[in-house]
Amino acid sequence: MLITNMTHHIAKITELVGSSDKGWQEAAKVALDEATKTIRGITGLEVISKTATVDPNTGNITQYKTTIKVAFGLER
């Protein structure tokens, strides 16, 4: 569940995509770290999808991408 311990009556959901050459978990962390720079009060996240870019010559993954949704309460 995306919204946990919600103290606000209204939550905003924002979708972000992070990327990494290390893995999907690192890509999610990149997205969350960037979100915390401009969004206050993030209460949870949900992983929506995981994708990757593959080098056609080697068959190796060159970039991992994780799409997440973050929830936060609206301030008045």
List PLM regions with ranges:
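A cross-kingdom feature marking charged/low-complexity
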Residues: 50-76
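Alpha-helical assembly-interface signal, strongest on the long, hydrophobic N-terminal helix that forms
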Residues: 2-8
